[in-house]
Design a protein with these regions (language model features):
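C-terminal peripheral helix-coil segments that are non-catalytic and often amphipathic
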Residues: 1, 93-96, 100, 132-140, ...
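N-terminal intrinsically disordered/low-complexity leader segments
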Residues: 1-11
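Helix-turn-helix
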Residues: 4, 15, 19, 23-57, ...
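Amphipathic, non-transmembrane alpha-helical scaffold segments
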Residues: 9, 59, 63, 67, ...
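Amphipathic alpha-helical linker/stalk segments
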Residues: 62-88
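Amphipathic alpha-helical packing segments from all-alpha helical-bundle domains
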Residues: 68-71, 118-143, 153-157
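Helical hydrophobic small-molecule/effector-binding pocket
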Residues: 88-109, 156, 160
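Amphipathic alpha-helical segments used for helix-helix packing
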Residues: 99-118, 168, 172
Length: 194
C-alpha cells in the first residue's frame, strides 16, 4: 500500500511540503532524509517519489513558493503614492510578512547553499524582483529630492539585509513589541536615505 488508508492524493503533496518545511527548519536540509519526510507524512518511502523526484525538488519548490507568495502579497497591497510613506510601508510589510512565516524565512536564507545551480538562479531571479521593488521606491525618492542615496543597489541590499536579520533575534515575548521594532527600523531606514 503506497498511501495511508483514508489519505487523499490532492492533500498529500501540500502535506509533504509542510512536513518538509518543518523538518528542514528544525534539523537543516542536509540532516533530513526522504524516508523521514515520508514517515511523517504517513507514506511508504517509495510513495514519496510520486510527488517529488528528490529532496532538492522539495526544497526548491518551498523556496520558489515563498518568494512568489511574497511578491504576490506585495502586489495585492494598496500602496501609498509618496516615496517616504511607501518606504515606511515597505518596512512594515517586510517585517509583518517575515515574522509571520519563521520557518519559510529560515530556510529561504539558510538553505540557499543546498540548491542546485539552476534552482539557485531561479531564487535569485525572484529575489531580484523583490529588491527591485525597494530600488524603485528609493529611485523615486531620489528623483523627488526626498532621499539621498549614493548607490541605490547597495542601499537596497543594506536595508533588506537589516530587515531579514529581524527573524534571527526578535522574540514575541521579548523586551520590545513589533510596533516598537517597526518604529525603530523605519527611523533607521529613513535616516539612512536622508
Amino acid at each position: 500500500m503506497a498511501r495511508t488508508l483514508g489519505s487523499h492524493a490532492k492533500h498529500t503533496k501540500p502535506k509533504i511540503s509542510a512536513i518538509a518545511l518543518n523538518l528542514f527548519s528544525e534539523q537543516g536540509f542536509a540532516a533530513v532524509s526522504m524516508r523521514q519526510i515520508a514517515a511523517k507524512a504517513g507514506l511508504q518511502a517509495g510513495a514519496l517519489y510520486n510527488y517529488f523526484p528528490d529532496k532538492q525538488t522539495i526544497l526548491s519548490e518551498l523556496l520558489i513558493n515563498h518568494m512568489e507568495n511574497l511578491l504576490e502579497t506585495w502586489s495585492a497591497q494598496v500602496l501609498p503614492d509618496e516615496p517616504n510613506e511607501l518606504l515606511k510601508f515597505f518596512v512594515d510589510f517586510h517585517i509583518d510578512y517575515h515574522l509571520n512565516r519563521p520557518e519559510e524565512v529560515f530556510i529561504a536564507y539558510m538553505e540557499l547553499r543546498n540548491l542546485s545551480d539552476d534552482n539557485f538562479r531561479k531564487i535569485e531571479k525572484l529575489r531580484g524582483k523583490y529588491e527591485l521593488i525597494l530600488s524603485k521606491i528609493l529611485t523615486d525618492g531620489v528623483k523627488e529630492d526626498l532621499f539621498s542615496c549614493k548607490d541605490i543597489k547597495i542601499t537596497s541590499l543594506a536595508i533588506i539585509g537589516m530587515l531579514k536579520e529581524l527573524n534571527t533575534w526578535y522574540k514575541k515575548d521579548g523586551r520590545v513589541s513589533v510596533l516598537e521594532v517597526k518604529y525603530i527600523y523605519k527611523e533607521i531606514v529613513l535616516k539612512a536615505v536622508s
